[in-house]
Amino acid sequence: MILAMDTATPAVTAGVVRLEDVAVLAERVTVDARAHAEQLTPNVLAALADAGLTVNDLDAVVVGCGPGPFTGLRVGMATAAAYGHALGVPVHGVCSLDAIGVETRGDALVVTDARRREVYWARYRDGVRVDGPAVNAPADVPADAHAVAGSPEHAALFDLPRVSPVYPTASGLVRAVADWTAEPAPLVPLYLRRPDAKPSSVAR
């Protein structure tokens, strides 16, 4: 059983997925950009309860590593690492855009909110990333796709048919892992630019 989580977008996502057939046994999603820290652990516990499982039934964890805001990413990645350490199971990190794009078909553009009037984006062909991830103003994003997925507010800026999903899903996170048998790489946040939130400096 796989615990999947993502906090790279306003959606606080946690789900339990059976790896063999990528069946989602339970998924909890709270859309609140200010509640990542408050909602992630309750969503994890609720998803486990919905699935009739406990943490001891988990074989691995997958977490979206961005791109996304500094504070949101930190919550998801720290939580995933803590579960992995406590349970002694591997933790796989994936690009959060891939967790959306892997569930699209044809030539699809995926966009999420990067703030500062910009979007994070990547382009996919039948679920495989072929360009990006990158951060640009919407007008500077290559729009040579046939559809757009991701943040509804930002997808609306493109003259393309909109498709789902709008946020990373538990099944998408699991599908985005290239090789479940491989040793996972260390978790590295994908910011694509300097974080807005920085540790406060101490005056000397």
For the regions a language model picked out, list residue spans one by one:
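Oxyanion-binding and handling regions
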Residues: M1-A23, A35-Q39, H92-R204
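Phosphate/pyrophosphate-binding loops at sites that engage ATP/ADP/AMP, CoA/4′-phosphopantetheine
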Residues: V44-A60, V141-H146
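A short glycine/serine-rich beta->alpha loop
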Residues: A26-A33, C65-P69, R162
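DPxDG-like acidic metal-binding loop motif
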Residues: V62-V89
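N-terminal phosphate-binding loop and adjacent alpha-helix
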Residues: D32-A49
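Phosphate-handling active-site elements
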Residues: A51-N56, G84-V94
